[in-house]
A protein has these predicted regions:
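N-terminal low-complexity or amphipathic/hydrophobic leaders
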Residues: 6-74
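Extracellular/luminal Protease-associated
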Residues: 78-120
């Protein structure tokens, strides 16, 4: 959380997502959210942090074998290792659950690294 002051993070925790989206919209940022994302569990604290983004595209089964995941430069692996402490990993899977945006091993790795949370639509 080097870029955003802790005081700013605390202030944002008190503001609704709808209010923030409206403010961004008024500033000309019209595509600043992923649609239909819901919390896994209601009643948990608001997740606030800088966004570290990753976008998946549909994979070709004939080209995207398990071997690609062994590559240390695979974008999913890079994102898990580079997402900064305190940040939120935001994954755009284009609403395709087959994209397998993150499993328990990757989520655990992010937790150990101090990432504040994950938002995904896939």
């Amino acid at each position: 959380m080097d870029h955003t002051a802790a005081s700013t993070i605390e202030k944002l925790k008190k503001v609704s997502t709808a209010t923030i989206a409206t403010c961004l919209f008024k500033k000309g940022l019209k595509k600043q959210f992923i649609q239909d994302v819901k919390p896994l569990k209601l009643g948990k604290p608001t997740m606030v942090g800088e966004a570290y983004t990753l976008r998946y595209i549909p994979a070709r089964e004939d080209l995207n074998t398990i071997e690609v995941f062994k590559n240390p430069k695979h974008l999913q692996r890079v994102a898990v290792e580079e997402c900064p402490k305190g940040a939120i990993l935001v994954i755009d899977s284009r609403k395709d659950a087959r994209a397998a945006s993150a499993g328990s091993i990757l989520v655990t790795r992010l937790m150990v690294r101090g990432v504040s949370g994950i938002v995904t639509d896939g």
